[in-house]
Amino acid sequence: MHFMTALRAAWRTRNSLLCVGLDPDPTRFPAHLHGQPDAIFRFCSEIVDATADLVCCFKPQIAYFAAQRAEDQLEALIAHIHARHPGTPVILDAKRGDIGSSAGQYAVEAFERFGADAITVNPYMGRDSVEPYLEYTDKGVILLCRTSNPGGSDLQFLDVGGGERLFERVARLVADEWNQSGNCSLVVGATFPNEIARVRELVGDLPLLVPGIGAQGGDIAATVEAGRSADRTGLMINSSRAILYAGADHDFAAAARRAALDTRDAINRHR
């Protein structure tokens, strides 16, 4: 699967800019899954099956799986998504950042072991730390730019010369120099719509992964208005907890579907 091709097809055929984040917390699972050895896979796969036709992509967060020694369940989950819902891109949210030789191994892990279609990457160490991911030209490389957390301003607003802030330099570098294979994207948080608009101005129609709506409080209308591309797509607007934990009983997947449908439709009202 070519990530960018699949993403654009999903925007069009599913009429959706919604990305569902898969951040499984076993303490919040329905009681009937407690103590089950494959609880993480069962929980996530039911969410996936209930919402796949409503999303443009899924985004499992690797830390939630690794903390529970459940990397094998992550591998099975991504395989399940590809088998049951062909054409649905999967972003491995790992935010990797290391020197080239280590980055190469992380790229193998993401794309060959787990079978992800894209990965989130920290660009702080520069181009050589990102190059091993870029070499997988059919895979998406989604680089942190203006993150949704409050502490993001500690570094991302630093002036790097000529009045240019660090997040702006990252956006410009990625769009103008690193995206030679057309497989780059950026992370820009929904909690900062002014910065979303600035990044969109700098990068043209480059896709943006936008976390921060739902539990983090980002405004959907402001996010869409600031971040949509000229063709009214260009966004992967992520919601995790507000969808995953919309219900807490046997009908949790149906509750997740209702929450995902409401979120997708709210996004579309502002396109």
UniProtKB/Swiss-Prot annotation:
Gene3D superfamilies cross-referenced by the UniProt entry: Aldolase class I
Family matches, as InterPro entries: Aldolase_TIM, OMPdecase_type-2, OMPdeCOase_dom, RibuloseP-bd_barrel
The entry's keywords: Decarboxylase, Lyase, Pyrimidine biosynthesis
SUPFAM superfamilies membership: Ribulose-phoshate binding barrel
GO MF term set: orotidine-5'-phosphate decarboxylase activity
Pathway(s) served: Pyrimidine metabolism; UMP biosynthesis via de novo pathway; UMP from orotate: step 2/2
Listed EC numbers: 4.1.1.23
Catalytic activity: orotidine 5'-phosphate + H(+) = UMP + CO2
Active-site residues, Swiss-Prot/TrEMBL: 95
Any one Gene Ontology BP term: 'de novo' UMP biosynthetic process
This protein's record includes keyword Membrane: no
Protein family per UniProt: Belongs to the OMP decarboxylase family. Type 2 subfamily.
Name by which UniProt lists this protein: Orotidine 5'-phosphate decarboxylase
Originating organism: Aromatoleum aromaticum (strain DSM 19018 / LMG 30748 / EbN1) (Azoarcus sp. (strain EbN1))
UniProt gene name: pyrF
